[in-house]
UniProtKB/Swiss-Prot annotation:
The keyword Iron does not apply. The gene is rplX. The lineage of its organism: Bacteria, Pseudomonadati, Pseudomonadota, Alphaproteobacteria, Hyphomicrobiales. Part of the 50S ribosomal subunit. One of two assembly initiator proteins, it binds directly to the 5'-end of the 23S rRNA, where it nucleates assembly of the 50S subunit. This is Large ribosomal subunit protein uL24. It comes from Brucella anthropi (strain ATCC 49188 / DSM 6882 / CCUG 24695 / JCM 21032 / LMG 3331 / NBRC 15819 / NCTC 12168 / Alc 37) (Ochrobactrum anthropi). Belongs to the universal ribosomal protein uL24 family.
Amino acid sequence: MQKIRKGDSVVVLSGKDKGRKGEVLKVMPKDEQALVRGINVVKRHQRQTQTQEAGIISKEAPIHLSNLAIADPKDGKPTRVGFRVEDGKKVRVAKRSGALIDG
């Protein structure tokens, strides 16, 4: 089970976006990276295609999972993730407050 999943609210721990919060759009476990909405935005030069015109577009670049932490459901501050079994299911738990992260 992954500690950070698609749809999670995360806080950036280091880099140019340190302290900012965002929602995980995609997780790439093989590369140990994630795409986060509004975080690590870079400008890319787009070549013209039949459907898209040329220009400079802004898009999110992947950020390493070690630079992200789950936002605590209670206070929004960064927390580590633990696991616990409840009703026969393995669930993620915020170490900071003990609150369930999913369901």
